[in-house]
């Protein structure tokens, strides 16, 4: 639920858009990184034609904030091969429950609509790249 302060900021265009809505929301962060809400998750992740890496995070989570630049760097290296998606679990508790995410940050590697690997906790760039290359059988560009 949106707090009064966030509501007022959103009303006057001073806050970031709320991802908790009754409509699917996909927000492009850059050319290969997107933030989605739970209503857009199936279309953007489960039904995606390419492999997808999902960053399950929360805004208040310090390790998630530390992981964010690593996730963005790796997303740039696999453009046109792997799609990268972020989902705020505070606003998408149904996704956390469905995919058994109990700690954050958690990275989910999806291929053909199924989770092929789950990385829990802060993941280094090298470990993330190794997992992507092993699970999806690809190399960075």
Predicted segments, located by residue:
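Hydrophobic anchor residue in the Rossmann-like NAD(P) cofactor-binding loop of oxidoreductases
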Residues: 89
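Conserved catalytic/dimer-interface elements of ABC ATPase nucleotide-binding domains
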Residues: 108
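Proteins that catalyze or organize thiol-disulfide redox chemistry
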Residues: 1-53, 59-62, 69-81, 93-94, ...
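A short glycine-leucine-enriched loop at secondary-structure breakpoints
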Residues: 98-102
